[in-house]
């Protein structure tokens, strides 16, 4: 998608709004009003778009600005996800409580996964520079808890020649742990986490079906 663009609110009906935003795309994430309320385009009508707001629209009025962010609504996948408690747009509730108490302020934007924590990364022993890797290849592991081993995989849609792989050590989520050159020559920097559009199904090699019910 293109970079961010600006528009304005035409109509408001609860969490559903009509906005004027030329060039909007279905599924695009938007920020609404001065509070930057989170929303998503759910339909297009010419240069207008219908959006759903994921926070209260109380106090908004026609004419207020809307920004299309140029990318779909996404989530972050990586170490820390399995230990976290999040709201519906993957905002970490524990961090929000520490900042704002029990009530979630509208328009509050916090990284879903902690950018200040270091994670113990163990690279896959079988991988060496020059190896051909593809989506789903295990780059290494992070021992997220005593019982949970988080496998760091090559994200979907990326594959090619492994240029280098980070040695064992503690890394921030934003640190580059591997570089991959795809067949077109583009170099991709892979981190301990990646973002994924919420409306796009995750690919899988096979699906294992349960044979026993979970008794609670």
Regions found by a protein language model. Give the residues of each.
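N-terminal accessory targeting/assembly segments
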Residues: 1-105
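Short alpha-helix capping/helix-loop boundary micro-motifs
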Residues: 15-19, 49-55, 117-128, 161-166
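Short, compositionally biased
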Residues: 43-49, 79-90, 148-169, 187-204
């Amino acid at each position: 998608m293109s970079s961010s663009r600006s528009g304005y609110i035409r109509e408001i009906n609860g969490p559903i709004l009509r906005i004027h935003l030329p060039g909007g795309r279905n599924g695009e994430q938007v920020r609404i009003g001065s509070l930057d309320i989170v929303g998503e385009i759910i339909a297009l009508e010419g240069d207008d778009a219908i959006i759903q707001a994921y926070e209260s629209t109380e106090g908004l009025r026609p004419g207020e600005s809307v920004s299309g962010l140029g990318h779909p609504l996404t989530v972050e996948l990586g170490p820390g996800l399995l230990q976290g408690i999040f709201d519906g747009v993957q905002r970490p509730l524990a961090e929000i409580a520490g900042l704002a108490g029990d009530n979630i302020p509208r328009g509050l934007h916090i990284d879903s996964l902690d950018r200040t924590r270091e994670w113990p990364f163990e690279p896959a022993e079988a991988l060496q520079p020059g190896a051909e890797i593809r989506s789903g290849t295990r780059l290494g592991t992070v021992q997220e808890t005593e019982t949970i081993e988080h496998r760091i995989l090559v994200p979907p849609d990326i594959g090619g020649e492994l240029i280098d792989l980070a040695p064992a050590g503690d890394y921030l989520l934003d640190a580059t742990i591997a570089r991959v050159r795809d067949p077109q020559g583009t170099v991709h920097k892979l981190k301990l986490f990646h973002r994924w559009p919420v409306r796009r199904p995750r690919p899988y090699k096979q699906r294992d079906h349960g044979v026993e019910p979970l008794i609670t």
